[in-house]
UniProtKB/Swiss-Prot annotation:
Keywords tagged on the record: Cytoplasm, Endonuclease, Hydrolase, Metal-binding, Nuclease, Ribosome biogenesis, rRNA processing, Zinc
Organism: Clavibacter sepedonicus
Task performed by this protein: Single strand-specific metallo-endoribonuclease involved in late-stage 70S ribosome quality control and in maturation of the 3' terminus of the 16S rRNA.
The EC number(s) this enzyme carries: 3.1.-.-
The protein's name: Endoribonuclease YbeY
């Protein structure tokens, strides 16, 4: 798995932890080991520019996903083909604000947003209630499974 993490924000993040979560999520979703993923942390100003440019929405947001090869989750017998999964852009400052509301750490929120972004790259969405149930259920399962795997480290 080629996972590149680039922190362009002023906030320190635990890059090895993000790397482990991304690897866990991609393995869980049976994505080909040669798939490529980029995760970029940006400050609020950069995120606001991206949010306006790509979503036509004002202000910064927490996470944006930019799929490349439109890969979908695989199965144990048939993993996703190798390819460019795409880019996930996370704003740690927005994540910090959301973490306070959610009652957990900023890093936990960044991990949640990373899992959320990966699911979007693999074609999941939450525009409709059924889609939301499926996507958020997978997101929860990934985060719980990852937390359990980290306890065993």
């Amino acid at each position: 798995m080629s996972i590149e993490i680039n922190n362009e924000s002023a906030v320190e993040v635990d890059e090895p932890l993000i790397q482990r979560l991304a690897t866990y999520a991609l393995d869980t979703l049976h994505v080909h080991p040669d798939a490529e993923l980029a995760i970029v942390m940006v400050d609020e100003g950069a995120m606001e520019q991206l949010h306006v440019q790509w979503m036509d929405e004002p202000g910064p947001t927490d996470v944006l996903s930019f799929p490349m090869d439109e890969l979908r989750p695989g199965t144990e017998d048939r993993p996703t083909p190798a390819g460019l999964l795409g880019d996930i852009v996370v704003c740690p400052q927005v994540a910090a604000e959301q973490a306070v509301t959610a009652g957990h750490s900023t890093m936990e929120e960044i991990l949640l947003l990373t899992a959320h972004g990966i699911l979007h790259l693999l074609g999941f969405d939450h525009a409709e209630p059924d889609e939301e149930r499926e996507m958020f259920g997978l997101q929860r399962d990934i985060l719980i499974g990852f937390a359990m795997s980290e306890r065993g480290r």
